[in-house]
Amino acid sequence: MADKVEKRILTLYSDVQATSVHWLWYPFIAVGKITLLQGDPGDGKSTMMMNLIAELSKGGKTPDGKPVGTPQRVIYQCSEDGVSDTIKPRLERCGADCRKVAFINEETYSGLTLDDERIRQAIIEFRPRLVVIDPIQAYLGSDSDLQIAGRARKLMQRLGMWASVYDCAIVLIHGLQLLNTRSEATADSGCHDK
């Protein structure tokens, strides 16, 4: 009878090599992590991201004036605006190098969801430094609901793994919808255990 190799369930923190966080825009957007940008409709979430995307694409500066360095690639996935009549003109007005900004064409590839393997494939092929999903609600899929914490955690774990493995920052834009049935504090989070 062969000796069984016993797997340890626990890992000691003393066995972990500490590393530092790499920032795309300190202290707001970390590389290898998910960032949630949320606010009320009309607060300028998408506009702020368009400006950041433009600066990244041309190697400009972060909103606080720090140099980006080398121009970076970005995937900007937006379901709320037209690509040719709204998104591209906005990018151009912001001064983006549109050769460094891409999207998954939803006319060709319909039914895109947050845990869709096509997002991972696009990240592998394009190697962006930043991926923006705008808004997160449009990419949940019919069987997902951010109000159910377990489902939301599963989606976030997968996206977080992709961000870490492929060394990119992922920003999820979330528009708040305050409901009269919940307090302001719980309405903001959008995710609750049921």
At which residue positions do the language-model features occur?
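Residue-level detector of intrinsically disordered, flexible termini
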Residues: 1, 121, 184-186
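Short, functionally important structural connectors and interaction interfaces within domains
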Residues: 16-17, 21, 183, 187
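Phosphate-binding/switch region of NTP-binding enzymes
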Residues: 36, 42, 46-47, 77, ...
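Hydrophobic positions on the alpha1 helix immediately C-terminal to the Walker A/P-loop
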Residues: 48, 52
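Gly/Ala-rich phosphate-binding loop of Rossmann-like dinucleotide-binding domains
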Residues: 57
